[in-house]
């Protein structure tokens, strides 16, 4: 997520993430180092890890002149179980649910996706996880491939394939 800020929204989500981590669910979180520069404490990832949540910072802010500082990850990807995912423009802060009136009335959009298309969201997240942890995540990909097929759950014959670009591809 680009912005996470303590408040009603984040505490509600954090409580669920912590509960699921305690139940043995693999809970992972990536937040942007610049987007959360003024909203989260320094080394907030350590607090998350104490709660059982695997947490990494994408491109931590370093106060030096560097073109890479502008490479930011604004994506908001939430994968629940490999079958249900969410994406959209909503950051995890109270102003995005009008609990706090920072920008006036805020209206944003997010979508819930169910089905095999969520695998692409999972792959996008795991790819970025490998980058921020500097680890080989190939075994993670095998562990998170959806193992169920629910053809009766959907009407129509459409096709959904989420896709992405990387904030690290050096495009200007």
Ranges and model annotations:
Residues 1-172:
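Charged, low-complexity intrinsically disordered terminal segments
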